[in-house]
């Protein structure tokens, strides 16, 4: 049987290999999303890989990056972009070429030429390779070249970053989030069409037959676009080659379940790390770990999972054995404190050069220590306890729940508690998403909540007015700063308007699962003896797919026919049982809007149990999403 993981990785590798062959003695300009894809492809060595391939220099490009320096004594430029906006290419490439004298220019585009990408928006809104090529030649010729410039524009489908063998993200589509209402903005339609073509090209390249399912209106739209590509292009090409392997592609709207990505109550330590550390600049799926604690002391307290403690302790022993041939004494109880002590001992007896070869292990150790001992760790513990309180309150009291009153009081005392409004907004999204339409909050409670939020916004406006220079600004803080409100009365009125808007958005969050029939509830109490818990829609869907005893139709999974010919065959197969997602060898679940580390962990556990107890061969499950999410990402996408 074809190994789909291997085939997808070959597909990714082919694009990068072709690019590496062209960068020798060239200046490379690469955008943020392509950098992130390359970062994961090269295991964090994107810059070094390009330099090793012979690149004379490497520069990042962005929509609003105008500081392109002049590069002397280099005659070739290689530009790598994942943008779907034609004006981006016109503006950015023109600025690069007006500052340099290049004889040769190669542009790698992740978006196909408009003559291929025929669906969706108008031809003017798509990238025309021929027009862009002519424009580039004009810009290059204006620099008084001694000979005719050489220009090539090449389609390079760069959009996948594998985080591990069972999980990948799509950085160029990291900003996609299904709208809470039914209005899909024009730029979203273009992006969705771009994603559909990218998926089509991938599955066509690896010769896969798709059974497409969608859950949610945004995913329905994506599924229709993808099916249109499969039907129209395959029909034009007369289906020259038969598919090798079947894949059940399940597309799910993130907004149907906003409880999971806003939850802090998680068993996944990766989630804790993602919540603790800042992201790498312009990355959505990786964090930056400060290595400086290796050369100074850190404050620690004992809190960490036993398994991770043991792994970290073993890492330190491995480093000690390879640097000074001495084994560290394993304490009776491994703690964050003992890890810190061992780390300081190794640091004091070794130089930087000897430690540098263990950089990856040291980063992991520092991540474990920092994620469990930082100031954020205690804040996350408090948020987790509030989340548990909300879950219990909603499950027991339901309509008579006083959780909004309690949250209103917490918002008023947030500074004293060491909490910020961003995290409390995430908690409110969690509560409204969890309640859905089954639990209605009283108008009085919502009015009190709105008033508390308005007061908090006003207080934050005054704080930012006094101290505008904050190093790390959240989307919430940036929004308040951009308002530029100086007058107190205006600030109060503005705060009230923002608070009212927040409440309206929260009501929309609660209504997201109204379109579903089987997955409207995200609270589960298995038995009277067990504690109620939050259960994600993804977990419910994958369990239903694997449950062979469930005879009912999966009503919320909307099935799309996988090809033009299959639609014809269905006329002759009406008496045959409809295909089920588990009928294929592979199941690929893509969450439009992003996926969490906790969801990846849950899927892995469910599949592991299924493989252990099932008599039949279990489909291989791959989880994917627009990006890796944490609660504050949801706050930014939903409110701002």
Where do the protein language model's features map onto the residues?
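Extended, well-folded catalytic/binding cores that form a central cleft or groove in large enzyme
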Residues: 1-640
